[in-house]
């Protein structure tokens, strides 16, 4: 079977690795154009491109798939199937129709819940009990196609956006390989999604990461986990930015953002309802540290009565 793979970040690269180890032929890889990254803003290839180049697979990086030249280029590959994972470009219907068996997508949620760009983080933020990967047939709508296969994992009280991402990146690739086999032998039939159950996972916005201490502690604790490792929740103290990488629910009352107490166990801050004990922070110019380490060296900075977010 001739497969074209389309994807961009590390999550997608894990899927490509599994396909390279499968019996199927990967005839080409599509990925986003190289982007500036790092302090030097040097153009860097995507994780998928780096993997494809290492395996001598032809790489295509069109700005869009909406023009006739890009579509003709894809059609010339004569693909039986296109596998799409976190690619980042919209595939118009004419592109979806090119492969003999159509296009399938590995999406990091239990569809129809969390269609869209940031399903992993939104699941943690919402306090969902479980997440997973859905392999679906693609159609013109955003993550609306018939579902071929689902794999499920519980979301623990300790899961972050990062830990859930890594777990789903392990679960998704074998599911895709299994789905391809089911498509090839006709044993897998798609299940239509119930649009009434759909929710939308909006793209992450850095502005969302600014902590609003008037919100309930339980919501903020989930947000802090969801946004770790990116974009990382933050607040201000003494006019300086403070990144908050981990927190636990605590008790206590005070003005939102007020420091209620500080000890090696954590920095207890009042919220709109209850309080949070901040256990891992990063100050400007420093690395992320447990609060017990910060407390030993910067005790005066975290005096009770000070207010974060002002």
Swiss-Prot record:
Enzyme Commission (EC) number: 2.1.2.9
GO molecular function: methionyl-tRNA formyltransferase activity
InterPro entries in alphabetical order: Fmt (IPR005794), Formyl_trans_C (IPR005793), Formyl_trans_C_sf (IPR037022), Formyl_transf_N (IPR002376), Formyl_transf_N_sf (IPR036477), Formyl_transferase-like_C_sf (IPR011034), GART_AS (IPR001555), Met-tRNA-FMT_C (IPR044135)
Annotated transmembrane regions: none
Binding sites annotated in the UniProt record for (6S)-5,6,7,8-tetrahydrofolate: 109-112
GO cellular component entries: cytosol
Pfam families cross-referenced by the UniProt entry: Formyl_trans_C, Formyl_trans_N
Keywords tagged on the record: Protein biosynthesis, Transferase
Catalytic activity: L-methionyl-tRNA(fMet) + (6R)-10-formyltetrahydrofolate = N-formyl-L-methionyl-tRNA(fMet) + (6S)-5,6,7,8-tetrahydrofolate + H(+)
Family: Belongs to the Fmt family.
Function noted in UniProt: Attaches a formyl group to the free amino group of methionyl-tRNA(fMet). The formyl group appears to play a dual role in the initiator identity of N-formylmethionyl-tRNA by promoting its recognition by IF2 and preventing the misappropriation of this tRNA by the elongation apparatus.
Protein name: Methionyl-tRNA formyltransferase
Organism encoding this protein: Pseudomonas putida (strain ATCC 47054 / DSM 6125 / CFBP 8728 / NCIMB 11950 / KT2440)
